Regions:
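Catalytic domains of carbohydrate-active enzymes, especially glycoside hydrolases
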Residues: 98-122
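Glycine-rich, aromatic-flanked loop segments that form ligand/cofactor-binding clefts
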Residues: 76, 111-119, 149-195, 232-234
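An active-site-proximal structural segment forming one wall of the substrate-binding cleft
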Residues: 105, 109, 156, 203-235
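Aromatic-lined substrate-binding rim segments of carbohydrate-active enzymes
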Residues: 120-168, 264-270
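Aromatic-lined carbohydrate-recognition surfaces of secreted/lumenal glycan-active proteins
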Residues: 165-169, 232, 263-297
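Aromatic- and acidic-residue-enriched segments that line the glycan-binding/catalytic groove
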Residues: 126-138, 172-198, 236-255
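Active-site-adjacent "subsite" loops/lids of carbohydrate-active enzymes
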Residues: 72-74, 78-93, 171-221, 302
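Ser/Thr-rich, Proline-interspersed low-complexity disordered segments
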Residues: 45-69
Length: 307
C-alpha cells in the first residue's frame, strides 16, 4: 500500500480592524513548512475493522456535490479558532464579508485549500445533532448565532476556486479554561462517563466504543449536510502519557496489549471508523500528526508510520 503525503505552505490569518468594520484581512506568512505529516489513511494499511457498524441514526441522504478536487499538490492555509476570535459573527452579512475577504486573500497567495476549524472544543461552527454551537460564534457555547457559519465558509471558499476541508479536534472538549463555560448540550455534560480529565482539560475517552461511534456519526452528519471537500484531523490525540488518565478504561478492557499499544489501537480504531464514514460520501479524510514519528507514536499514541 502507498502512503500519500503532501507539502503545504502554512500561513497564518489575522484580522486588523478599525471602527466601521473590518479594514482588511491579512495573511501573514509564518513560514513554509513541509506537511510530511499530512496523511491520507488507507484502510488496508490499518487492517480489518474492530469498530462496530454505524448506528441506525441519523438516517442519511446523499451528500451535496463537492467542488472539484484540489490539485495533487496541496497548498493549504489553516484558519483556526484563533482567527475566529477576530471574525465578526454578529450577523450573517458581517460574517460573510469577513469570510469572503479571508478566502480572497488565501486565493491571491496561490493556495488551493483551506483547513477551516469547525469543531475546536467539542462545539461546532454549524448546527449539529452531536455538538452545540461553538462559543466562538456568540461568546456563549450553545447559543445559535442565527445563521450557519460553515455554510458561508463553504460557499465563499468555492467561489474563489478553493477546496475547503472541515478541520476537527476529535477528543478535546475544554483546555486551559477554553471555553470558559460548557453548556448543557456539551458531550461533557450529556455523557460524563465518556470524559477523561487532565490537570488542564477535558477530553473524550479514546477507548470508548461509544465515543468512536459518536465521532464517526458526526462525520456522516457533516458529509451529508455540506459540500465539504475533506475532513481534517490535526495532532490532538491523547493529551497525556500519564497512566492514570484512563487506567479504569484500560483495566475494564481486559486487553493483553501494553498500555501504549492499547492506546494506539484506540486511535487507529477511530481513524478507521472516520475514514470509512467520510469515504462513503466520497469525501477526503486526512490527518496532520506532529512532525516526528516518535512524538506521534510515544507522545500521543498516534501510529502515523502505520497509517
Amino acid at each position: 500500500q502507498h502512503l500519500f503525503s503532501f507539502s503545504a505552505h502554512m500561513l497564518g490569518c489575522m484580522a486588523n480592524r478599525q471602527r466601521g468594520g473590518i479594514m482588511r484581512i491579512f495573511l501573514s506568512t509564518l513560514g513554509v513548512f513541509f506537511l510530511m505529516s499530512f496523511l491520507f489513511i488507507m484502510p488496508a494499511v490499518l487492517g480489518p475493522s474492530t469498530t462496530p457498524q454505524p448506528s441506525a441514526s441519523p438516517v442519511l441522504s446523499a451528500a451535496p456535490t463537492p467542488s472539484p478536487a484540489a490539485a495533487q499538490e496541496i497548498r493549504a492555509v489553516w484558519v483556526s479558532f484563533l482567527e475566529w476570535q477576530h471574525t465578526d459573527f454578529s450577523s450573517e452579512s458581517a460574517f460573510r464579508a469577513d469570510a469572503a475577504a479571508i478566502m480572497q486573500n488565501i486565493a491571491s497567495l496561490g493556495a488551493n485549500t483551506v483547513f477551516a476549524h469547525v469543531r475546536p472544543f467539542g462545539d461546532a461552527l454549524y448546527p449539529s445533532r452531536y455538538f452545540p454551537f461553538s462559543h466562538l460564534c456568540t461568546g456563549t457555547q450553545g447559543q445559535d448565532p442565527g445563521f450557519d457559519p460553515l455554510a458561508v465558509l463553504v460557499e465563499t471558499a468555492h467561489a474563489q476556486g478553493l477546496t475547503l476541508e472541515a478541520w476537527i479536534n476529535p477528543y478535546r472538549l475544554q483546555a486551559n479554561g477554553t471555553p470558559a463555560e460548557l453548556c448543557a448540550q456539551s458531550p461533557a455534560l450529556l455523557h460524563p462517563n465518556w470524559v477523561k480529565h487532565t490537570a488542564t482539560g477535558l477530553y473524550l475517552d479514546p477507548a470508548s466504543i461509544e465515543v468512536q461511534q459518536y465521532l464517526a456519526d458526526s462525520i456522516r452528519e457533516l458529509c451529508t449536510n455540506y459540500a465539504i471537500d475533506g475532513i481534517h484531523f490535526d495532532d490532538y490525540f491523547y493529551p497525556t502519557t500519564a497512566p492514570d488518565f484512563d487506567a479504569d478504561s484500560y483495566a475494564a478492557s481486559g486487553s493483553t496489549l501494553s498500555l501504549a499499544d492499547w492506546r494506539r489501537q484506540n486511535v487507529n480504531d477511530l481513524m478507521r471508523a472516520c475514514y470509512a464514514a467520510a469515504h462513503a460520501f466520497n469525501v477526503r479524510f486526512g490527518v496532520s500528526p506532529q512532525g516526528t514519528l516518535s512524538g506521534c507514536r510515544d507522545g500521543q499514541y498516534s501510529d502515523a508510520a502505520l497509517w
